[in-house]
């Protein structure tokens, strides 16, 4: 009996071992399947840590057991399967050069990855340059450099525009008095000794209207007679003096008043001289001229202007205006600062009586 019972027990033990063998094999296969599932999980997105509700710490054995218990034994390749959409944070690229306080670290940074594998961008962990750090890019702007500088503007051009510093007097060894006018890159030397009696031909008559509309008077009664010695030399330097003085007196627009009364025919300059004056006159002076007012124009003055029309522009011709008396001139501009020669006043009284002025 004892032998039969022992044999039965051995038989039961063997049957149990045989029955447990498939379970052990299934458990081994299940473990292999888990390993394969973990390897495949690198290719497929996993559940969010908040949704899984488990810790993903690889050193926590309890977490491994719970993850193994919740991992499916098969992959459902067909049908609807809840998948988490993987969001990748954009790379943060700063095109800044290396600063002195970065310790060799490049300022070009990418979004840091969190230890749990999520793609949340931690703004507080990004390194930003402090206010005390200065970049060595060489493109920093100071308060003085924000406005462009006129580097190409020379001293002579600045003086010409401002009307200061472009004229000085020089005395020669022979006692001649010279005046130098600097007009841009050019310098004009004027023999003031020979033109001293004729300097009154050009004068400043104040301003007209709003702004800086200067009034320039040209009194032809002060011109030299053509019978004097060195007439061409005197007229050339007189023209230089008039142009240089205009550059000093005229800042913007101006009104030129020609007082032709009291001028003899011997004082009328030749046509070639007037044509040369017009061509040599700076374009700025021709453009800024608002009007040329001719007072007491005689027939030969009008004939002169008619002969000059082929050589002057139509715009300049339309700027010419003729007045018959000083009274008409007083209605156009103020005569308080205008110096009118006595010969012109006498002619106006002879033509219009005492009420002319």
Curated annotation (Swiss-Prot):
GO cellular component terms attached to this protein's record: cytoplasm; cytosol; nucleus
CRAL-TRIO domain boundaries: 191-352
Gene3D superfamilies in the cross-refs: CRAL-TRIO lipid binding domain
Known function: May be a bridge molecule between BCL2 and ARHGAP1/CDC42 in promoting cell death.
Alphabetical list of PANTHER family matching this protein: BCL-2_ADENOVIRUS E1B 19 KDA-INTERACTING PROTEIN 2-LIKE PROTEIN (PTHR12112:SF21), BNIP - RELATED (PTHR12112)
Subunit structure: Homodimer. Interacts with BCL2, ARHGAP1, MIF and GFER.
The protein's name in its UniProt record: Bcl-2/adenovirus E1B 19 kDa-interacting protein 2-like protein
Organism expressing this protein natively: Homo sapiens (Human)
């Amino acid at each position: 009996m004892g032998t039969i019972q022992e044999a039965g027990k051995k038989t039961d033990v063997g049957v149990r071992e045989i029955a447990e063998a498939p379970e052990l094999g299934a458990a081994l296969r299940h473990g292999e399947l888990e390993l394969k599932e973990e390897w495949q999980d690198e290719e497929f997105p996993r559940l969010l840590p908040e949704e899984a509700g488990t810790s993903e710490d690889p050193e926590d054995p309890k977490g491994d057991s719970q993850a193994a218990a919740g991992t499916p034994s098969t992959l459902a390749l067909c049908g609807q399967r809840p998948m988490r959409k993987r969001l990748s944070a954009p790379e943060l690229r700063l095109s800044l050069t290396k600063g002195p306080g970065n310790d060799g670290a490049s300022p070009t940074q990418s979004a840091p990855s969190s230890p749990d594998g999520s793609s949340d961008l931690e703004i507080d962990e990004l390194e930003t340059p402090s206010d005390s750090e200065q970049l060595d890019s060489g493109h920093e702007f100071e308060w003085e450099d924000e406005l462009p500088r006129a580097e190409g503007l020379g001293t002579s051009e600045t003086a010409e525009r401002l009307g200061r510093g472009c004229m000085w007097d020089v005395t020669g060894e022979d006692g001649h008095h010279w005046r130098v006018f600097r007009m841009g890159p050019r310098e004009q030397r004027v023999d003031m000794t020979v033109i001293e009696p004729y300097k009154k031909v050009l004068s400043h008559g104040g301003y007209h209207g709003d702004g800086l509309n200067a009034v320039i008077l040209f009194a032809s009664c002060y011109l030299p007679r053509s019978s004097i010695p060195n007439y061409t030399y005197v007229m050339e330097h007189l023209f230089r003096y008039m142009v240089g003085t205009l550059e000093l007196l005229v800042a913007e627009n101006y009104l030129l008043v020609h007082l032709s009364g009291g001028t003899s025919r011997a004082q009328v300059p030749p046509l070639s001289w007037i044509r040369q004056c017009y061509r040599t006159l700076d374009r700025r002076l021709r453009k800024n001229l608002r009007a040329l007012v001719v007072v007491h124009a005689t027939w030969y003055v009008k004939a002169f202007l008619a002969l000059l029309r082929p050589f002057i522009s139509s715009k300049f011709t339309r700027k010419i205006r003729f007045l018959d008396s000083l009274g008409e001139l007083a209605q156009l501009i103020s005569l308080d600062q205008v110096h009118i020669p006595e010969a012109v006043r006498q002619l106006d009284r002879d033509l219009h009586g005492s009420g002319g002025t």
